Amino acid sequence: MEIWLPPSEGKNPPGEGPSLSLSALSFPSLTDTRKKIIDACAQITDEEQAHQIFNASLRHSAELEANQALMSQSCAPASAVFNGVLFDALTAQEPRAWIGEGSQHITIFSGLFGALKPTDLIPLHRLAMGTKLPTLGNVTSLWKSVLGSALAEDYSEKLVLDCRSSDYKQACLAPWAHLWEVRVERLRNGKRSVVSHNAKKWRGMLSGALALRCGGIENASDLEDALAEVTPKLRSRDARGATSHVKEIEVSPAKATSQGGSTRTLTLVTVEA
């Protein structure tokens, strides 16, 4: 099984490290598109324009500055650069997920690089999927034209735990894979509602719990067995101090896709303890 993640908006600036080497990144067939996007980012030098295009605030000044010279920036592993809710939860659940065998089964999608492995060395940057660059147009559309064919080489017919957000799903619909899209709901007073922000934390915890098991999960039955074992152990504490756990899991029937793959929805039904 593979695990697909979105990037995080929050990032840790790399300290001292090597500069960006596109030829060293995973999925080398994406190199030309990466170069085009990096060049397009470098052309946006007006500060006000950059804040508008990259949907940035003052706290993103370092990221916007890095965008103008990405090839010369210091780099660190992608798993260390991204530091949002999902990544923090995954690391807390299973720190070993980012190294060794666990990392081999994780792919991080990116507006700047298309797709990455956790060990790929990348710089500080800011470019979300869905951004419209003046010289290239919508980044999602650009990646959609190349990501599918590039990733099919490695992931055709593979089982994928899909934790991506909508923009990153649109960049690669992957009709050749068997996607399990993760949804999180809250049960309260007998009614269920969709969890939005805290869903990132649940997806991170679930990914961490399964990361080291990926090599042994070959089909839907294997995944259901693994879920039955790991989900009862997951716990999330919110800002109020309330702790939630997974009451039940639901798996929708598989829907066949046009290129031999399928999609399902995996729903974690959570409840406060």
Put a short name on every predicted segment.
Residues 1-127, 131, 142, 212:
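Near-N-terminal "mature-domain entry" segment
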Residues 93-273:
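Internal, well-folded beta-alpha domain core
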